[in-house]
Structures are given as structure tokens and as C-alpha cells.
Amino acid sequence: MKMFRRLSSVVVIALLMPLILVAMPVPAAQADQLPNPDWVALLSDYEKDYWQAPTDAAHGGKVLDAKTMELDQNLAVAINHKAAEDLDNKSLNAQRKRALVDSDLQAEETMPGALGPVLGAYMSEGLKQGKLNAVADVFSFNVASTYASKRAAMHPRPYLNRAESSFGGTNDLAGLPATLNIKQSPSWLEHVPGYSNLQKNSSYPSGHTTGAYSWGIALAGMIPELAPQIMARTSEAGNNRIVLGVHYPLDIMGGRIGASAQNGQYWHNEFSSSIVPAARQLRGYLTERCQADEHGSTLAACIADVKANGAGGYTNGFLDSVASEPVKDQASAVRVYTARLTYTFPQNTSQSGADFMAPRGAADVLRLAYPELHADQRNAILKATALDSGYPLWQSSDGWQRINWAKALCARVTLDKNGDVSKVETADHVTLTGPSVINAQYANIGKHPASDSAAGENSSVSAGPDLAVLHAAQRPALMVGAGVLVTILGAGATKAVMGKRSEKKRAESSTVRP
């Protein structure tokens, strides 16, 4: 049964701060509001470099870069064919079934499994029972519209006759084949692939991928200890659109860009009013379930007990030419996710080495993972973990294409004596139990505190004993000795006291298009 998503959200009354903090009133401060992202502009490299969109029956679309578009189609066919191996007598296998579930475009079906079988079951039950309404609200509101960006591209899907324009004209494919040998999947139970509904709908960008990444980035930001696995599962949901033969890799990459920008805006504008309540609710609920089943008294202890960041967490043995190793732990999750950032497209080395400037809002997504740090320090983490320039779609994306959420949200960060980020170690190189900061006592030195207001970030109450969101006036009270490692702790037993707030309508429609 699909969960009914209520369009309500909540405000938070402050909890007691952790014992390491000095309890004091937190003055409210209003963050500046970021506008809705211009998704057409962010994704416009596609129309500039690879595909000229059709405009009417007399003017069909045109392939601009045959080499890149050939690789795009060949990858789509290879991934689709690999996923069609070892079918049962109903032409189904485990990978197709998971792809069909993801095709429903329901957060409560796709995202819980990212936490592994134990925590995922808890989350699924909480969503179905209405006990995670604040989380459901984030999944409902925090989605990007792909309507305008699809209209700007109007690129044919891989299972169709690609020579036929959406407007009835003829596309110039620059010698590429009009039809591809796509293996279509049948339905499974109530889960349908939707081939008949997508024929007039542009392949670029993928709306399902946009939805999955909108949810996945938000979930990883709220449970950063499991960010590598959450983002690997999110990338699988995007890849499953290729598995079903309805999208190409560039479509998936475009969806990730759009969803990343959406999260930047949402986390910036709705951090105190929506994100913090949802994170507190989710972490508190998971902790209570863990305690009841004797998996530990904190979320951190539970993650360790059920091995959610290893063999007892999200795993995936579906392989292809891009995801060439199974996901079985944090390190492999980061590697598989990173491979899907570029889908093996070659780098234009003449464009490599461009300085990375974190787009506005990106640092907000790291606020719960690194509550000790200021905006410029979180931007430094994003820069240290970013993809190099020169890969498809990077130039128009305003930096969103280059962000590696699996690395940035779960890293061991070292500060020097000036408070600058001097080292960032990620889960593909070191074993981590969650995001952490070494030498956090230097975080408030120099210009760093001022970067919060410069970024337009608002002050916030605590997200709970394990996710302290520190107001600028409270940061000096963070008592840590030299060289002490400050890391995310397990959720405490203190519960949030929440009140209802009036509903807000978004400035534009948030409908996700397939």
C-alpha cells in the first residue's frame, strides 16, 4: 500500500543541549532564502554540447557530438542487457524486480533498503505507520520539477524509434542507429515499467533519478554515518532506469545534478523548520527500535551491532561495466557511487583542473554531519572530495555535477591550528564509523565563524544529543582537548517536543516528471 503523503511540516522547540555544551537561549535568526534552482540552465550543457532539441515537425532534433552520444547509447544497451541475464520463466530476475519497484517512484519503497535489512525494516514500518511524518514531509516537499528541463531537451528514449521526433518530424542522428536492441521487462505484481506512458516524454533528464536523488541526499544528510551506502542505493535507483531500458547514462547524471541543486535550496531554506525535525524524528525512532530489540542504547551502537555499515547493511551484487564490483561495505559503496558519477565517460583533459567553487546551499547539506564546522570549512570538504572538471555536464551545473555526496557526508576531517581543513579522509581509504573532526577546538579561529552569516545560514536549535547544531554563540562552549576526535554519537533518549506549523506552498510546482 502506498503511503499517503501529508503536505504538513513541523517546527521544533529546543531540546536540552548535550552535556558538552553550555545551555543558553538561542536567538532566532532568519536565513536568506534561496530561489528555486534554474534546472534548465543547470542542465543546459546537454543541449549545447550533445543534442539539439527539435522545435516543431519541420525541425527535428540533431546529434551534436556523435562520439559521446554513441557511448551513451552503448552503455545503455550494455547495462540493459547485463540486467536481462538469468531470467526466470516470467522474464524476471532480482535486479529487474528491484528496478520495477523503483519505477513506482515512491520514497517509502526505495529508500529504507539503503539502511540495510534491520534499520531499513524499522524505517519502512515507521513510514507506513505514520510515525515518521516529518521524514515523509521532507520526501514530499524536497523534490525537483523536471518538466521544463525535459521540454528543453526532448530527446527520444532508447526503446523507441529515435529517428522520430516528438513533434512528428525526423531527427538527425549523425549516423547513429535509429533503434537499439533494448530488452524490455514485463511487470511484476503491481510494479510496472511504464513503457507506453513515456513515449512523448524526453529521456533527459531522468525524473525518476531526480526523485531518488532528492530523497537519497536528504536521507544521507540525516544519517551521515551510512551516507556511502545510502548514496550507493540512490545511484542504483537511478541506474535501474537504464536497467529497464527507458534512459541513458547522461539522463541519470542530469537527474543527479537537478536533485543536488534541489537539496541545496531545501536544506538552506528549510533547515530549522523541516530538516532538523525530520532528522531528530528519524534518528530517535530508529534508536528506540534498536533499544527495544537490544541492538544497543544509541544509534551508533546499533549500527555497529547490526553491522549496518558493512555486511549487515545495504549490499548489492548487481554488476555491469560501470559498477564492476559488488557493494558489500563502506569502501565498495563509495567506489561504486563514484563510478556512476561519470559512467566511464572520458574526461576532456583540456578542461581538467578547474577550481571547484561549492554552489550556494551545498554546505548546508553537511550541517548535521559536521555540526562543529562553519560554512567555509564544510565547503572545503566538498572541494576536497569533488570530482575533477572536464566530465560531461560539468560546465553548466554550477558545481553540482562535481559533488561526491558519498565522500563528503562521511569523512574524517582534520583542521590545522588556523581552523583550516588540512586533510579529508574518506571511507574508500580509511575505516569510518561516521563523519568526524580532528582538532575541532580550532574550528572557531579567525574568519571561519563569519562564514556562516556570509553564507546566509540561520541559527538553529539542537537536532538532538547526537546531532548538535551549534549556534555561533555556543560554539566556544564545545569543550574538546587538543587532538581530540569529535564524532557523531548515538542518539540520546531525549525526545523532541514538536508543534504544528502552517502549511507553505512552494513558489513553483514540485511535481516530478518521469
Q: Could you describe each region identified by the protein language model?
A:
Residues 17-28:
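C-terminal segment of classical bacterial N-terminal signal peptides
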Residues 1-14:
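Bacterial N-terminal signal peptides that target proteins for export
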Residues 486-514:
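C-terminal membrane-anchoring or membrane-association module
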Residues 220-229, 266-272, 459-468:
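Secondary-structure boundary elements
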Residues 208-212, 239-279:
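Alpha-helical transmembrane segments that form the membrane-embedded catalytic/substrate-binding core
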Residues 32-243, 277-280, 312-452, 456, ...:
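Hydrophobic alpha-helical bundle signature of multipass membrane enzymes
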Residues 451-484:
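Extracellular Ser/Thr-rich, low-complexity/disordered mucin-like segments
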Residues 262, 276-296:
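Extended charged low-complexity segments that act as oligomerization/scaffolding linkers
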